[in-house]
Regions:
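Canonical Rossmann dinucleotide-binding motif of NAD(H)/NADP(H)-dependent dehydrogenases/reductases
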Residues: 1-18
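Conserved NAD(P)H cofactor-binding loop of Rossmann-fold oxidoreductase domains
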Residues: 72-77
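C-terminal helical subdomain
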Residues: 163-164, 179-205
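Active-site loop immediately N-terminal to the catalytic Tyr-X3-Lys motif
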Residues: 82, 129-135
Length: 205
């Protein structure tokens, strides 16, 4: 409903796609998007696995021709070694990692693995190296990098697997950072770059 996720919805709508957007809060989404006949908003908290499983399953059953899945759920809690706690760690991994596994399980259930579709997993360059205030976020994104690479190693012929690792993007998450963020870009620009590469050859964006 914000950041890169919302910007991707807007980019896909601009390119003429029908878009289904899942988020826990739709109040941030502008009316121009909500009112777009090509856009459907589905409210669900992906860290609530039981309810999300039912909701996503129903979405997939009603939309048998989905051709692109962008798994973008994520939260950023800026914790360091001195102030992190287990509750924040669990919240981070529930949303950033386990909800992605849940989504993949439901994709497998409703769509043939050899179907011609794109499966994109949103990680981050923070997954490659530890950063300040990223003792929770960084490891969760590192897990997604490994997950995408593992899926790619089992690549099915018609499955286009993409690993997306944005750098620093202007979002509520990066606003709390006090360190220098090189090559900082807008969500709109990040979405444009992602869309321009997601259907081309290559694994990582």
């Amino acid at each position: 409903s914000s950041g890169i996720g919302y910007a991707l919805c807007e980019e896909y709508l601009k390119q003429g796609w029908n878009v289904i957007g899942l988020a826990r809060d739709g109040t941030k989404i502008p009316n121009k998007t909500i009112d777009n006949p090509k856009f459907e908003f589905v409210k669900t908290d992906l860290s609530n696995f039981d309810s999300s499983k039912l909701i996503i399953d129903e979405v997939f059953k009603k939309n048998a021709n989905i051709s692109t899945f962008i798994l973008n759920a994520g939260i950023y809690i800026p914790d360091s070694l001195n102030d992190f706690n287990f509750e924040n760690a669990k919240a981070t991994f529930d949303t950033n990692v386990l909800s992605i596994y849940l989504s993949i399980e439901l994709i497998k259930k409703n769509f043939e693995l050899n179907s011609n579709y794109t499966l994109a997993i949103m990680s981050s360059t923070a997954g490659y190296k530890g950063l300040p205030k990223s003792i929770l976020y960084g490891p969760s994104k590192a897990a997604l990098i490994n997950l995408a690479e593992a899926i790619k190693s089992e690549m099915h012929d018609n499955l286009n697997v993409k690993l997306i690792c944005p750098g620093f993007v202007e979002t509520p998450a990066t606003k709390v950072n006090s360190f220098k963020m090189p090559y900082l870009m807008s969500p709109k620009e990040a979405a444009r770059i992602i869309y321009s590469k997601i259907y081309k050859k290559g694994f990582e964006i």
